[in-house]
């Protein structure tokens, strides 16, 4: 029963761990295992998650949302703010944190509207927020875990990375804007009532986390050594805000470790390594998009990066590959679970809307890629 519960709660970690264990039968553990682990990626990942958890704990993002909503007067303005928050914030705070923060916030806001408006807007807006977070996050190395990993692996500079993904981000933003206008084509004035965020923020903690976030940026830009920033964040959180350490997603870090071991072992199995390299050669984008549909894009990025050095194609493929199935990006499950918990009768409708809209977005963006 316990193993079933663990699998249901952490399916990706469970599968990654099983794959690592199975691969160890073919390549018995030895000193080379340590060389599989990308400690820089793990340290940056932990650092970012700890800083974001600290800022969320101080309701920084909720306050930002309330401030922006204070200026909304129509359903279109409301939709643009709620979706825009996810699109733009995900570039810096990751797609996961964006959805964890702003999807529950959306329920709170829409519950203050009349029933007919809420019914019309709820599912489309949450669906748009999910797509917005996944597509907004692809513009920067900080936006999602696979970008962070592939950016470090590729040795690209920040400007090259942003320019690589900028066309897809612009197209995504235009598509979301068109959807928002269409959704609110029978626009009406609304009144959004605002409630104060419960607790007063600790301004010293917010300033501290702001400084630590800048340190994370400097590490990503390869200005600061990752070890120093990791140690500083760990020590600061431990002594200044210990509960934050309990809100870090350690399962994601363990998933990375398990996948590093699995991929490292596969690379030492010559027959499999040669086969996968042949499949990938010249088809990196398509293979990574397809792999993401089944494994989700983070495992796909880590797996395929061991068998090609065309990291630009992998970045495009795994970012676009976050569209499609519900598990193509694990961040999408955050929104689905929220829908299932808050309006369980609508989860089937949401799933259908999510799948159709994701396929449409994926088809258009893949068409844009094919034309480049």
Q: Where are these predicted regions, by residue range?
A:
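Hydrophobic transmembrane alpha-helices that form the pore/transport pathway of multi-pass ion
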Residues: 88-138, 302-316, 344-349, 369
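Structural signal for alpha-helical transmembrane segments and their membrane-water exit/capping regions
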Residues: 3-32, 42-59, 181-186, 215-243, ...
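Membrane-interfacial loop-to-helix junctions in multi-pass transporters
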Residues: 39-41, 70-83, 113-125, 203-207, ...
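Transmembrane helical segments that form the transport core of multi-pass membrane transport proteins
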Residues: 36, 58, 62-65, 211-309
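Membrane-core helix-loop-helix motifs of multi-pass transport proteins
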Residues: 117-184, 190-195, 336-367
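C-terminal transmembrane helix pair
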Residues: 162-173, 286-372
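Flexible interhelical linker loops that connect adjacent transmembrane helices
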Residues: 2, 66, 182-210, 242-246
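Interfacial loop-to-helix junctions that mark the boundaries of transmembrane helices
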Residues: 3-9, 30-41, 156-168, 198-202, ...
